[in-house]
UniProtKB/Swiss-Prot annotation:
It comes from Conus quercinus. It is found in: Secreted. This is Conotoxin qc16a. Changing N8A: Has an excitatory activity before killing the mice. Has an abolished activity. The record marks D1, H7, N8 as: Essential for activity. The keyword Secreted applies. Disulfide bonds join C2-C11, C5-C10. Expressed by the venom duct. GO terms for molecular function: toxin activity. Keywords: Disulfide bond, Neurotoxin, Secreted, Toxin. GO terms for cellular component: extracellular region. Found in the dissected venom (DV). The cysteine framework is XVI (C-C-CC).
Length: 11
């Protein structure tokens, strides 16, 4: 899983 960090970006 990845955390949302930005407009439509995953971190």
């Amino acid at each position: 899983d990845c955390q949302p960090c930005g407009h439509n970006v995953c971190c």
